[in-house]
Curated annotation (Swiss-Prot):
Chain residues that bind GTP: D14, H15, G16, K17, S18, T19, N131, K132, I133, D134
Function comment: Required for accurate and efficient protein synthesis under certain stress conditions. May act as a fidelity factor of the translation reaction, by catalyzing a one-codon backward translocation of tRNAs on improperly translocated ribosomes. Back-translocation proceeds from a post-translocation (POST) complex to a pre-translocation (PRE) complex, thus giving elongation factor G a second chance to translocate the tRNAs correctly. Binds to ribosomes in a GTP-dependent manner.
Organism: Yersinia pestis (strain Pestoides F)
GO molecular function, one term: GTPase activity
Protein name: Elongation factor 4
Reactions catalysed: GTP + H2O = GDP + phosphate + H(+)
GO cellular component: plasma membrane
Amino acid sequence: MNHIRNFSIIAHIDHGKSTLSDRIIQICGGLSEREMAAQVLDSMDLERERGITIKAQSVTLDYHSKDGQTYQLNFIDTPGHVDFSYEVSRSLAACEGALLVVDAGQGVEAQTLANCYTAMEMDLEVVPVLNKIDLPAADPERVAEEIEDIVGIDATDAIRCSAKTGVGVPDVLERLVRDIPAPEGDPNGPLQALIIDSWFDNYLGVVSLIRIKNGSLRKGDKVKVMSTGQSYNADRLGIFTPKRVDRDVLNCGEVGWLVCAIKDILGAPVGDTLTLTRNPAEKSLPGFKKVKPQVYAGLFPISSDDYESFRDALGKLSLNDASLFYEPESSTALGFGFRCGFLGLLHMEIIQERLEREYDLELITTAPTVVYEVITTNQETVYVDSPSKLPALNNIEELREPIAECHMLLPQEYLGNVITLCIEKRGTQTNMVYHGKQVALTYEIPMAEVVLDFFDRLKSTSRGYASLDYNFKRFQTSDMVRVDVLINNERVDALALITHRDNAQYRGRDLVEKMKELIPRQQFDIAIQAAIGNHIIARSTVKQLRKNVLAKCYGGDVSRKKKLLQKQKDGKKRMKQVGNVELPQEAFLAILHVGKDSK
C-alpha cells in the first residue's frame, strides 16, 4: 500500500494535460513505442477531432523510482472544459493528490482556479507543474508568481517541464512519489469500492471503473451494490495500462475496472459503493453531489421510426455520462422525442454528436432554454424547462430566472470590452481584483445569457485571452416573456422562446426575419408572426410563387386581364385554406443564432 500513488491531472483547456499523460505512460513503459499515439487516452473519435478531453480516463503504471523502489501509479486524465467540471470532481474523489498543470505562456486561467479549489476542498495534495517551457513565449517566473498570487499555493519550487519534448517529466514523477501521500484504508476490513465511472460495452454489459477504499476484491466474489441491494458476480476485473488487462485481485488503494454482467443500465450508478455480499460494509462511502443540468433542449429523431433506438441510445449514454438528464416529450411540430438536460452548450453539442455517430441517429434539436422558477397566482412554485410549459401570462404571479456567478480572468487591456459585453448581457459586477497584469472579474449574469453565446462573444472580444468559469448562484425575479411564433396563424411550439421583455421586440423581429429566409416559397403567401400573448410584435411574409396568367393576352381587353387575375387570386385563397407549411430543419436551428450576427 505504501507504494501506491493515486493522482489526477487537472488544468485549464489546452494546457497540456493529455500530452503530459502520454509522456508519463511512455516513461513508465505502459505502451510499446509502436502503440504510442498522440493523446493516447482520448479514445473517442470526437475527442481526437476536437483535440479536447471529454471523458476522464484512468491508467495504472509501474514506475521504478530513483530510490530503487517500484511504485504503482494510478492516474486519471481529466477534461478541462467548464461543462465537464463534474467529471473532474469525480476523478478527484478517487485520488490522494493532483498535478496542477499550468501553461508557462498563458499563465493561470479560470479553469485552473476552479479545478484547483475543487481539489483543495477534498483535501488533496496539489503539486504545481509549469508546462510548455520550450515555447518562446514561456515565462515560468511570472507564472509561478501568478500561481502564488491568484491560486494561493506555494510554487517557488514548481517543476518546470515540457510535455511535448519530454524535458523535466522524470522530475514530475519523482515529485509525485515524494509529495503525494499513499492511500489510507484497511486492507483486511470489509470491502468498500467507489464506482467512479461506468460505460456500456455491447459484449460485456456494464463496465465500471472502481477505486478500492477498504478491503480487497477477488475474481468470482459476490458483490452487492449498496444503494439498490442487488448482488452480482465479479466475473472479470483488472486494470488499464491504457489497454484492459485482467487481474485476479484488486487490492486496497487500487483503481481498476470490473465487469459483473450487469445488463440493467441503472444497476450500478456512478458514485455508488460496492461491498461483498458475505461480509458487507456497514455504511456506504460518501458519493458525489448530484449536478443539476443548466441547459435544456428538446431532441427529436428526424424519422419517427428511430424513436425506440433513440431511447436505448440515450440510456446507454446516460450511463457513461451521469450528468445527462432526459424525459420523454412530444411536440405537435416534431412528433415524439426527449427533453434533455445538459451542463452547458458544449456538453449539448457533444452529446448530440455522440448520439449521431455512435448510434447512427439523425436528430433535430430545439433551442436551448434554462430552468425558470414560476410562482403561480395560487402560490404554487413550478419549475419550467421549456417555453411550451410556461403557464399563461395571467396565471403568473412572478417569474424568476437563474443567475450565474461568472468568474473571468483576463489581461488588463481587454477589461473595457469585457465589461461592455457583461453589461449588454444584463450583468452586475460584484468584484474586481488586479493581479499583476491580469484582472479577476466577478459578474452576476442571467444564466440564459451565459448559455446562449456568452462564451463565444467573450473569447472574440478578448482575442481568446479571457477565460470563464461559472456556477449557478440563485433565482431572481425578472420580467421575462414568452415569444411565440405563428406561421399562417398557427403556433409552432418548437419555435417559442423565453426572453427578457426589453429584448423581446428585437429578438422577435430578428427571428421572424431569419425564418423568412429559411422557409421555402410556396404557392400561397405565408405569414410569419411573432407574438407575446395575443399581441403581435413582428411580422413578415414569404411571398407566393405565381404564374404569369396574362402572358397569353396580347394587348387585349382590361376586363379580360382582371378576370384572369381574379381567378388566380381565388385559387390561391382556396389553396391557402387547405395548404400547410413544411418547416425545414434549419428553421428550428435559426433560434440558436438569433441576435448573434446582427449586433
